[in-house]
Amino acid sequence: MKRIYVITIITACTMIFAVVGLYNMFWKKDADRTIKAGFVYVGDASTAYTSNFMDAQEAVDNAFGDQVHTIAKYNVAEGAERQSIEELVAEGCDIIFATSYGYENVTKELAGKYPDVQFCMATGDNANADPVLDNYHTFMGAIYEGRYVSGVVAGMKLQELIENGTITKEQARLGYVGAYPYAEVISGYTAFLLGARSIVPEATMEVCYTNTWSNYLKEKKCAQALIEDGCVIISQHSDTSGPAVACEQTDADIPVYLVGYNQSMSELAPTTYLIGAKINWAPYMQQAVQAVLDRKKIEDVVVGKVNGQDIGAGFDENWVQMLELNEVVAAEGTKEKIAATIEQLKNGRIEVFQGTYIGVNPQDESDTYDLKKGYPENAKSSAPTFYYILQDVIDIKE
């Protein structure tokens, strides 16, 4: 009987040691695992848009050290992304981040071709469209929140200019340099105007499209044209510093101010820059890389609002951030107002796309939307979907 007990104990110990040994072997294998992460950029560090993504890549490098090797392709024009993505696959990338909206169709196609590689499309909107691929994902921060806060800052400056007699309420006009008449751009400038009108209800806006994401001369020329039309605060959804330089160099009779995007323009426009907003891409990218390292599904690891293969978040998860406030130029009390507005957005106490406005689809004037009922931006997609021009308060410059 004792012999049976001894054999049983020996057998049990042997099994335990075997299990522990296997666990340690595989755990150590995963702990020592290294992967490659690829990044495809439409520009380089000279443009605010790409520089912002590069900050997120640097955050990945800092977070993972030798465990993750990052590889980047710069100045990849929309339409030329196939070769760059194929090169990243050939170089052994386990996860690839494509960072310009125009890349999405080719990126999804290549995801189907390379099922062992994870493809993450920033600003994309096609992850949940057929065919849905397990290795193709879209993500974006709810930047309309940041645009709204930027608009509040602009509104406070307009109010200050009205109160000190620099302009009248009728002159409370914003200008906006937009790249394309896409939902992403329209949603952004609408939120910006609505933020301003929460402070100055008489504020209106004029929009000038460049029809390119990044062209310094076109963006500067657009901003100059808006200033000539009487706009006193200029903002942008474009990639260069052209609007900032236009504001700083203007000799208009009325002072002109700037609200930026993606990158502070305080050095280029120290006397006109107010504030800016940006998407913080680092949380998604770091968590997606962690998911690949841990061999887990990205949507099970990234913290945000998950909708199928798509994830988004706003101020609540630090996916949207305000850039530095130029307190020398901003109206008194702006810093406190920013903090209060962000808190209200986090708590759902502000519904941005709501009010006594009628929006008109620029591609189909019979398609209108009454904002009295509110528009739930990002309800089903991290990419913006609001695509209506507000009647009577927004003009599109021809």
Predicted features and spans:
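Gram-positive cell-envelope targeting signals
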Residues: M1-A31
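Flexible loop/hinge segments that line or gate small-molecule binding clefts
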Residues: P115-F139, Q263-P270
